[in-house]
Amino acid sequence: MRTYPIADDINIEINHIKNWIKDYFVQNGPDCKAIIGLSGGKDSTVAAKLCVEALGKDKVIGVYMPQGKQHDIDIAHEVGQYLQIQTFEVNIGKICDTFYESFDNSFPFDNVKENSVVTSNSPARIRMSVLYAIAGMLHGRVVNTCNASEDFVGYSTKFGDSAGDFSPLSDYTVHAVKAIGYALGIPAKFIDKAPEDGLSGKTDEDNLGFTYGVLDTFLETGVLPEDYEVYKNIMERYKRNIHKVKPMPMCYRVGPCHRENWEL
């Protein structure tokens, strides 16, 4: 298994990411803006800060997307004010309700609103649709804010928060993202905010059944968790969810594959 060690000098990592972001925009739209959903958590805050430092604050747009009344949306607003970037707010509450209600009279199964798989994943996909709508109108590129820890155990929604045009943090564990955030001078209240699922009131770690500290030690060093049940939980989640981060399998034609020649 590959591990995810970070440089002894975190500034080496920071400069690497900023240069990578700059190069991405040179190659994929020098006039484009970075469009990022701001939740008030560490990942979106750190990713947005890196984009601001790489591109300038005038080329970064933050989007708040509460679902109805959201108790922690004020923290997201504070992040936007801290970054001094242009922001928009789109409340997805009514969009979600309309989406669920569209199944009421035509769907031959249980009440969609009571299906936890639907209600936990649909808002993330709707938020991503909002980001791409804004990106389409403003000539932007959508920032993916997932980290390596979440990706390894599949703690994301396929085509939801796992989507995006470029992903500056996907090779960094939660531990590394926090270290980057502190080194960037981001206020601790944004970095230390415990991530929640936004539905049950539980933290991510409550839902996972282990801490990111244990997971990150495993990912960064390869040292197995002392508790075998935790290790088994981690690996079962990895095997069950790896499809979320792998490219979509494709059936290639018999004979020469023309897609292989698309790279000019």
Tell where the protein language model's regions lie, with residue ranges:
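Short, surface-exposed alpha-helical segments at coil->helix boundaries
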Residues: 44-48, 73-77
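ATP/NTP-dependent adenylation/nucleotidyl-transfer catalytic domains that generate, transfer
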Residues: 1-36, 50, 58-61, 67-68, ...
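Primarily recognizes the serine-hydrolase "nucleophile elbow" in alpha/beta-hydrolase
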Residues: 53
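Conserved G/P- and acidic residue-centered "switch" motifs that form tight phosphate/ATP-binding loops
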Residues: 41
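His/acidic metal-ligating clusters that form di-metal
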Residues: 126
